[in-house]
Amino acid sequence: MIVKNISAIQYFQERFDIIDTPYQYTVDYHPAAPKKTFTTNPTFVAEFHDCFAHALPLVITNENHMITSHLWPLLHNTKYKPQKTHDLWSKWNDNMEITLPPAHKQFSEPYKYVWLPIDEHSANNAWHIWIDVISKFRLIEKKFSHKYTDFIYVLSGPSEYFDRVARELFPELRYYVMPKNTTWKFGHLLAPSMSNHEDGITVPDMIKWLRHKFGMVCNARRKIFISRDDAPARRLINAEQVFMALQGWETVTLTGMGIKQQIELFSEASHVVSTHGAGLANLLWCASGTKVIEISQTEMLDKKVYPVISHHLGLIHRVILGEKVEIRGDKVKGVKRKKDFNDISIQTSALFELINGL
């Protein structure tokens, strides 16, 4: 089968109604940040008839268009190298020959099935699940004026984190999970776009919708220090020294904590201090005015994901740079990039100066 590889956002703009138009904002989270002004992509809900969905994930339309970009980016150079991770194609190009396995299942009912693609590398990352998967419920509600639970969702692969969130927050949600390397056929498939691009340029209304839909209204009075002592990397090696100096603060470990517990914890936080990590996705639940200090390092100063969330929700967010402490040995499972495989040390005096200045 010869398919046209679709990557331009104009393809979707010409075919489907736009829900969120592009929006520009500025986030001044650190004086040395390489970029501070960002522009969002338009959002939409695509509709495909007589199409095939593959668990890689990708969609092949009835016009033989291959859809990955703007629904879930297919990073073929790093994650999906032909003949190593799949046998669908041998060479990536604008027009390419693919070998799609026969459809294992077929679904014909219109306006019922919603495509939720995600790759196995991101499937249990809290930030990706909230920002790139669950956020798509909002586009479905805005497009069709129905509750998101009126539809059936199709996840391109398993996600234990999504399962946990579903059990606690929306147990009535109906969804299927595609087995690896399988193809399903749909008479009509709804495909919401991402509300995030370039790893953190998020649509403001999406972030606000998540807090409104799943957050709690609490008395924000707790000062919390998020421990990453059980994480494989980005641990604060002088965390004990820092905490001893943080009079009246709580040290919290998120591992093993339920989803509702985490939402309640961050809803009650007036101050949050943490090294950069997926646990900061919980900033979604903080009340406006919450003060956030994110401990990072120079090599990661382009990571704007959490400062942008804070900007949209009216939080006061600052990034402080610590000293990188290399970890000996090979990168371990759970760390995506080699540059992320290190720990951090922070000057206590600099941290307190920043806290007192907020």
For the regions a protein language model found, what residue spans apply to each?
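The feature primarily captures lumenal catalytic ectodomains
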Residues: 1-358
